[in-house]
Amino acid sequence: MDSTLSRRGFIASGLGAAAGALLAPRRSAGAASDRFLIVNADDLGLSAEVDRGLFEAHDAGIVTSASLLVDGPDVEAAIQQARLRPKLGIGIHVSFDDRGKLFTDMQDLAAVQQQIDRQLAAFIRMVGSPPDHIDSHHHMHRLFNVARLFLVAGRRYNVPVRGFSDVVFVGRFYGQPEFGKADLSKISVEVLVAMLRAVKPGVTEISCHPGYAESRPDAIYDREREVELRTLTDEQVKKTISEEGIRLISYRDYNRMSRDAR
């Protein structure tokens, strides 16, 4: 979730050459003027309520990709439902405990590496194939000291790591610009339509968190999920995508396009 970047203060902006050495730019097929959009929903497997909303957004024709929490309480049911939707791309949403709460000691790189390896192995075992992209809960993979570990994993499986490929990441569609403080105006139809109209040629990802409110009292991002779901499935959003000539794709499609362009 985007607010973590600002409150943690460890954005991986200084990786520069190191990141480039590990993960060369991936060139996508298509005309230079083509506008491709990945709409990726985080937190698949977190709960039955979240998963229900996520799948509704996919079934409505807007969400094209999802990031799976392999330690999520609803992960097995989520995978079963995802198999019924072959057009939905699935990546991994690496977390550092069973509900994705912030890991207290990200300086322990051996422990971080162990978690990355364990969760990737679990993903392959449960899903039956590697993820089509790698990211993390609360964007922890962008922390300067651990970003390299994620980049190595991306290179190992030849898949993009969110924020370290030529996919332009747009994370502003989020209802808590300050952690714990809801601002539903940030996830309105008007805001999303403006984002869509601003999509440039190439490949862009808009991150989202659709779902239904959970019954547990400790849910951090809850009613915002339902607002996101309503916004994503609004007819004006679909109309704008069509009018703008935006082509919706998944990370799986992006990977195939990148291979074809080589």
Stretches found by the model and what they are:
Residues 120-199:
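Catalytic domains of cell-wall/extracellular-matrix polysaccharide-remodeling enzymes
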Residues 54-59, 77-91, 124-125:
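Acidic (Asp/Glu)-rich catalytic clusters
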Residues 24-40, 45:
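C-terminal segment of N-terminal export signals and the immediately downstream linker at the start
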Residues 48-72:
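A short alpha/beta connector and helix-capping loop motif
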Residues 1-18:
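N-terminal secretory signal peptides and thylakoid transit peptides that target proteins
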Residues 42-44, 69-71, 93-99, 137-139, ...:
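Active-site beta-loop-alpha junctions enriched in small/polar residues
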Residues 36-38, 63-65, 87-91, 131-133, ...:
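Structural preference for beta-strand elements that scaffold enzyme active sites
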Residues 219-262:
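C-terminal domain-boundary segment and adjacent tail
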